[in-house]
Structure formats: structure tokens, C-alpha cells
Design a protein with these regions (language model features):
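Phosphate- and other anionic-substrate recognition elements at nucleic-acid/protein interfaces
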Residues: 1-143
Length: 143
């Protein structure tokens, strides 16, 4: 069980890798959203033993390059509603402290605590296929 918390910003992100009970496998570090940096993170994750889940907040469009990269690589990626993360952080943090590093730790910790409730991101092609099936079911049920 390995949770990768990514605090996404414009052009860069802060990444923290945690195991259960708050064990930090990789201290928070910054990375750019370039292909070289994403491949380096992918290489790091491939060296880890255990099931990996990548967790990030939805941030308008800024999270999309990271989301797409890791989804296409076959990772379990979960995109969290910012309001849910804000509530979680409020309920679980020491008041006043807010930095990108602390946010990445908080997001990774959210991934550990909500491990079995995390929803895996489905790519657009999967969503459109499901909508197509739903549309067919609706037509079949009305005829």
C-alpha cells in the first residue's frame, strides 16, 4: 500500500510518497510537468514494491498533464474534489500551517486513509462507452 500525494500547481507539483502509519518513503520534492520529470517519477515508482495509488486534487487544467501521463501508464489515479480535500485537511491538520510540502503529505495521507474508497479515474473513452451503453439501454427500455 503506497500512496503518492501530488500537490499540483501551475507548471510544477510537489510529490510525497507514503506508506501506512505515516511512513514517508520519499520526502516531498518539487517536479516540473515536463516529460523528462514525469518519466523520472515513473521510474521511481516502478522501483517500489506494493500497490501504488496516485492521488491529486482537481485543479482546473493544471492537473491534466500529470493525470493523463499516469493514467496512460496504467496507474491507479484518483482525482479528489478540492472541497473534500479542504475538509479533510481542516479536520486533520495543525492549524495555520499550509505549504506545498505539507499539502502533498496531506494528500498522500488522504490516499492511505481513504484507500478502499478512492475512485479510479476513468479516461474519456471509458466514460463515452458507458454513456453509449446507457443511451442504448434507455432506447431499448422505451421501445
Amino acid at each position: 500500500m503506497i500512496s503518492v500525494g501530488i500537490d499540483v500547481s501551475k507548471g510544477k507539483s510537489t510529490v510525497c510518497i507514503l506508506k501506512p502509519y505515516g511512513e514517508i518513503m520519499c520526502s516531498p520534492f518539487e517536479m516540473l510537468h515536463g516529460e523528462k520529470e514525469l518519466n523520472a517519477l515513473d521510474d521511481l515508482l516502478n522501483k517500489l514494491d506494493g500497490e501504488i495509488r496516485i492521488v491529486m486534487e482537481a485543479t482546473g487544467i493544471y492537473h491534466l498533464p500529470i493525470l493523463t501521463f499516469f493514467h496512460e501508464k496504467g496507474y491507479f489515479v484518483s482525482v479528489i474534489n478540492p472541497f473534500a480535500m479542504k475538509k479533510y485537511a481542516k479536520d486533520n491538520s495543525i492549524r495555520g500551517a499550509k505549504t506545498d510540502k505539507l499539502d502533498s503529505i496531506m494528500i498522500a495521507n488522504y490516499g492511505i486513509e481513504k484507500w478502499f474508497k478512492l475512485q479510479r479515474y476513468k479516461g474519456d473513452e471509458e466514460i463515452y462507452a458507458e454513456l453509449k451503453l446507457l443511451g442504448r439501454d434507455t432506447i431499448w427500455n422505451f421501445t
